[in-house]
Amino acid sequence: MDNNEIIGYTIGETRIDELTFLAKEAPKVGDYVKINYDDSELLGMVESTIQGNMALEDILNIEHLEKIREFEDNSSYYILGKIKVLGDIRDLNKDGALKLPRVPPKPGIPIYRADDELLKKVFGNGHLKIGHLVTREDVEVKLDANKLCSRHLAILAMTGMGKSNTVAVLLRELNKLKATVLVFDMHGEYKDIYCESEKLRVHIIEPKINIYRINDDDLCDLAGVDAQATKQRPYIRKAIKEIKEERKEHDFSTVDDYINAIIGKLEEYKSNDNYKKDESSIQTAIFRLEDMLQFRKNIITLHYNPINDIREHYINIIPMEELDENAVDIVVSYIAKAVLDDRKRIIIDKGRDFAKPIFMIFEEAHLIAPQHRKTRAKHYLSRIAREGRKFGVGLCLVSQRPKTLDAETLSQCSNLIISKLIEPTDQKHVQMASENLSEDLVKQLTSLNIGEAIILGPCIKVPAIVKVDKFDGRYGGEDLNLVELWEKDFINTERLKTDDIEENAFGDDDLFS
């Protein structure tokens, strides 16, 4: 189609943000158009189209329909569409979003297909190449890294629709910018990430918490002391308070020394006549602490500050796949708090010129910050979402279950990358969290293919339906090839059976008898 060719005309009552048009040919939903009138040069997105035939509107008899079809021609058909007005492209070189016009265009104004060169100016000036427009393969889409990281991001989609690939592409692009990234990797998908086109700077951080530095309730939770254990918890708190008054962290050489010191205090209480009535509860608390030493040894330590483990300008991966939900909550909250406090301290003590920006990616965000359940991590994610921008701490929530993700935290994510969502409750939850997600764009979510996404927010000049690049490398999020694995396992199993049969055939014979 000629870029200067008129594709249709505005009709009906027009608005500054939305137009109805009558088209010559059906444009692709998600494609871009241009409208010139008065002193404005507007860019718009085709949000929906319908086709009709006035001669067939009230036909209910199939024979009548077939007879009419014999005599009809293309002039009987009409195409109507809806355009979302995105703004005046004369503002394109200015910082920020395009501005809507003050006056809507009149009905009958011609509509043109936006040319590729214009769209390349709109979408090609960012830092992070994420993909290309679904409707224009030659138009690359690049996101503004400053606005993506500082105004927070949510990556939302059904399982298998390309979330992990999107994260991998973003990691590759952030790596090019020498960004400092921290990934809470719930399923170990990224710990072995490899890229063919770019040498990734990857640093693995083992999930650890300083048992001396966490608060008393977190220690009790980690030890498995029930939140309703109104006798066990006060005794543990009392023991910790006395220990910390007597000895500092450097006085303990190992975790065992510290926990055994607490257990020693509890043993003293147990043998004290004043606490005889609670002897059973105290003993249970001792058992819980002993169990913690045995079963939580992999994540508890002393003399540890997670900030010292984070490498600047690296993709820092924290594999969490071996931790249960409770341990994940404590580890995430502990590290998230440490990062926010550290970045705040740098700004307050040294000033903005010494800031150390960091972008934190939280996989399975609906488990860390659930909608209807209180968690420690949700508190700190919410704080980062509200305060992080001022201190260079960016947030990315990744989830396949948006409806169970905390709405307050999600609403602070101004940037959205949304792939296919079918459930109406998921769609509604996301729409309520984003004022920029129109009803017509929501309707597009069910028809997106694997790897396609709607991107909107400050990181992009105007909303776009994008084909996200296929990550050129390896990570752990791809679907398993079940048929291939079954076949391979079957061959190996049959080979072992054959070997056993051959071995048994000769095993009982004495060849030298």
Swiss-Prot record:
Belongs to the HerA family. Its EC number is 5.6.2.3, 5.6.2.4. Keywords: ATP-binding, DNA-binding, Helicase, Hydrolase, Isomerase, Nucleotide-binding. InterPro entries: HerA-like, HerA_barrel_dom, HerA_C, HerA_central, P-loop_NTPase. This is Probable helicase MJ1565. A probably bidirectional DNA helicase. ATP binds at residues 151, 160-165, 467-468. It is an enzyme of class 5 (isomerase). It holds the Pfam family HAS-barrel. It comes from the Archaea. The keyword Lipid biosynthesis does not apply. Disulfide bonds: none annotated. It catalyses: Couples ATP hydrolysis with the unwinding of duplex DNA at the replication fork by translocating in the 5'-3' direction. This creates two antiparallel DNA single strands (ssDNA). The leading ssDNA polymer is the template for DNA polymerase III holoenzyme which synthesizes a continuous strand; ATP + H2O = ADP + phosphate + H(+); Couples ATP hydrolysis with the unwinding of duplex DNA by translocating in the 3'-5' direction. GO terms for molecular function: ATP binding; ATP hydrolysis activity; helicase activity. It comes from Methanocaldococcus jannaschii (strain ATCC 43067 / DSM 2661 / JAL-1 / JCM 10045 / NBRC 100440).
